[in-house]
Swiss-Prot record:
Primary location: cytoplasm
Annotated Mg(2+) binding sites: 20, 22, 179
Residues annotated to bind phosphate: 53, 182
Modified-residue entries (N-acetylmethionine), positions: 1
Native source organism of the sequence: Bos taurus
Protein name as annotated: Phosphoserine phosphatase
UniProt key word Hydrolase: yes
Amino acid sequence: MVSHSELRNLFCSADAVCFDVDSTVIQEEGIDELAKFCGVEDAVSEMTRQAMGGAVPFKAALTQRLALIQPSREQVQRLLAEHPPHLTPGIRELVSRLQERNVQVFLISGGFRSIVEHVASKLNIPSTNVFANRLKFYFNGEYAGFDETQPTAESGGKGKVIKLLKEKFHFKKIVMVGDGATDMEACPPADAFIGFGGNVIRQQVKDNAEWYITDFVELLGALEE
């Protein structure tokens, strides 16, 4: 068991910090917003709830939800133009502070790369530091499925990405920050996990995370000490 003060020290000395995106870096769940935009909100948000609670394997839940939504390329582009995701208060300052300290910041999401890259651009995070699912479209722009080879398409995918980052960049300390069970499961291989409940509180995470925050100000404060 790592003590709270050890966790704080680990966060402050990390050479990489990985953030979940939906309900962590942004206030919304991207897939639910896409479903709402495409007119199938209720059915899809119930599936998301089950997936986040760990009741359904991630890839199966993603396949089912996308089969309902059937988003076209144009719908995704219009969603970003008309209803762009809202950054969670404090995240811009936190990411900026980490980058000033030469900490690598990554976004690891079970959501969609087109949405996550839009978020990354707002935070000055290079697209090479984004790991998310890729939607596939036919040449006419209609939905053609998703890239099932991406690690983020699987249960345990976030842990696979972190393992890959350690192998590639030889990071000594990686911290994962997120709201969901899939984020908590990424530690290990992450060296520490910080639960985030600023947008939605998932009881399983709140009960089991050694360090649980509801405001990014707390992490900013730890860096300033």
